[in-house]
Amino acid sequence: MKKDSRVYLAQILERIDRILEYTANGEKAFFADSRTQDAVIRNFEVIGEAAKRIPDEYRKNHPSIPWRELSGFRDILIHQYEGVSLSQIWRIVEKDLNPLREAITKVIPALDELERQISGDEEPDGG
């Protein structure tokens, strides 16, 4: 049975929140703690994997989310780990994570609508 897309979107939001929590003490603390770095990288990997599992139709209808970039960053982290710059990761945390969280939160209601259309239900209450 395929997981519901809401599960993947919830995973993305949960992992974003974890990264924000782990990095709340700022840049200096991030660069000083390899455990925090590893935790942040792992959560980015999970975000990318969850993004890959969102159906194409949903991704096409929500181009405001950088689906390809999320998946691609995951691949870089997994396959080219040595080449990953902690400065690049920090830049993403600092500049991209909150806007991504906001964008994901905004598109979740559209998933409910798409699933209603696919199932043939006209209204959320079934009437």
Regions found by a protein language model. Give the residues of each.
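Solvent-exposed interaction patches of small proteins and small membrane subunits
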Residues: M1-G127
